[in-house]
């Protein structure tokens, strides 16, 4: 399998912790933590055929600083033939009306650039009203709620890593 580029915003330690856990759970796959998103350039995204991108959702459904500044640039890239798996952190109890909306914003940007999204997961087990991250009844990636469901995080990451390894290798979307 080709090297995977891992991109995430370091604005919150939780996102960094989840990125580290994902890298560990992908054992045997070469993952290069590119640079923190605040130091990423367009050519960093174009250098990888397989990418994992992550961000938390802030306030009323916004991306953290740096990701929000990078989205217009992402949308203008040519990422046809590239696969992107997204992970996002959110709080379903306190923000049920925009739960992990940041993932949806990233998904829109990468799709506009021509990338194929992989790593879709079930919405079962979450209690929320609305989310921009839901596509066809599934989340457009791995959803982590460390505030309310931390006990489920390790299994969710392990299951998702197994799934995206297969999808990156085969091109199959769940």
Which residues does each PLM region occupy?
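A short beta-strand-loop structural module common to alpha/beta enzyme folds
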Residues: 29-41
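FMN-binding flavodoxin-like domain, especially the glycine-rich phosphate-binding loop
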Residues: 17, 25, 29, 47-174
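Residue-level recognition of beta-strand->loop/alpha-helix junctions
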Residues: 8, 35-36, 88, 121
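Short, surface-exposed acidic/glycine-rich loop or hinge patches that mediate macromolecular interfaces
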Residues: 9-12, 39, 57
């Amino acid at each position: 399998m080709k090297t995977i580029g891992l991109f995430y915003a370091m604005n919150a330690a939780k996102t960094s912790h989840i990125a580290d856990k994902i890298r560990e759970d992908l054992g045997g796959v070469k993952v290069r933590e590119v640079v923190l998103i605040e130091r990423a350039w367009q050519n960093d995204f174009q250098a990888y055929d397989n990418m994992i991108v992550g961000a938390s959702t802030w306030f009323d459904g916004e991306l953290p600083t740096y990701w929000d500044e990078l989205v217009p640039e992402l949308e203008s890239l040519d990422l046809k033939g590239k696969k992107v798996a997204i992970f996002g952190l959110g709080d379903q109890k306190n923000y049920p009306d925009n739960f992990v909306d940041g993932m949806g914003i990233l998904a829109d940007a990468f799709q506009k650039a021509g990338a194929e999204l992989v790593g879709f997961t079930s919405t079962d087990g979450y209690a929320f009203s609305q989310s921009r991250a839901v596509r066809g009844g599934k989340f457009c990636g791995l959803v982590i709620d460390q505030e309310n469901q931390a006990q489920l995080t390790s299994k969710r990451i392990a299951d998702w890593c197994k799934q995206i390894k297969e999808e990156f290798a085969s091109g199959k979307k769940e």
